[in-house]
Amino acid sequence: MKLNNKFAIGCLIQWYEIEMIGEYLESLENAINFIKGEADIKIDMCFNINQDLEKVDTKLISMEEISEKFYSIVEEKLKDIPYTCWTNEDDIYTIADYRREFNEQYCDEVDVLMWGESDSLIPRQTFQILDNLHSSVKENTPKYVSFFSTCKMWDESWLPIEHTEFTDKPFIDGDTENWWSLRYNMNIDEMNAFNDKVEELDIRVINQYKFNGCGLVMSSDVVKSGVNIPKSLFFIHEDTAFMLQLQQLFGGKIPQYVIKNILLVHNRKHTKKRSYVKGELKTDDVSGGRLRHDWYKKASDMSHHNCYNMFNQSKIYTWKDVFNG
């Protein structure tokens, strides 16, 4: 099946994600190889080895060894698949920075943009579904966002994007054993078991936006029209800022297409998400590891403030405020 539209998928990989990145790359490989015809899909990755925020525990491994391991994994997983991969070392570089620049660069080159994420597994049907969706809606709604379904979330506001087989399950705080739970680490075979049995897509339209950044899809016309991540978002909350920009500029007139019965896995509490970080313990979960760094909560709070005060007269914080304030 030949794809009729052009795509770009971009992912920032932090050096400490080295032990889990192979899973994302394998899912990406599966999605590319699932296409049985011509396809124009630009794969973009940034490998961030800057240590201004987190430092490598050199008693365990060196940055050179991490870099060698990363590029070996990329070559193994993507094999003959074309990709662009570049390394950042000199400056602090966050998910907000990467996604902003990815949008700016590729919106002029492709029809559809997708945000990859190092702790995600994308469905192998991804690009066929998105190609058919874009071809179906581009004449009447050339500006849109889209989202595959996700696991059981913590409150009812997420119901519109929960997978149809997950949404009637209970949310159990801290649960790592049940397959529908937020903290459960799902593998590719488990994801495929849900997606491969789908015979007819359940695509729903919502205008009260609900998404996170993991796997967010947007038509390039959305970015060309001025929706992007503001530079005031220097750390996190970039997905929320993008959503607020979308609401502010278009007042809910741009649809969000939710592919309700196709699961995109977000292993947000992956047990290997933060490896070899100096000062963190193997027993730390993702949140616990981050909070061992004095700067983290301050940067998170300041980025949160910037996100929710974009449209009023309020101070914009930067990394300088985090370290010197």
Model-derived features: positions:
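A conserved hydrophobic helix/loop-capping motif in glycosyltransferases and polysaccharide synthases
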Residues: 7-24, 31, 48-50, 149-150
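Catalytic phosphate/metal-binding cores of nucleic-acid and nucleotide-processing enzymes, i.e., regions
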Residues: 14-24, 86-87, 96-98, 126
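Short, acidic, metal-binding catalytic loop of nucleotide-sugar glycosyltransferases
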Residues: 23-41
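Active-site-proximal specificity loops/subdomain of glycosyltransferases
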Residues: 52-110
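Conserved catalytic core of nucleotide-sugar-dependent glycosyltransferases
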Residues: 103, 123-227
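Short beta-strand-to-loop acidic/aromatic patch adjacent to the donor-nucleotide binding site
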Residues: 109-121
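Short, high-confidence coil segments that cap the C-terminus of an alpha-helix
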Residues: 110, 139-144, 253-254
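C-terminal catalytic/acceptor-binding lobe
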Residues: 198-221, 225-325
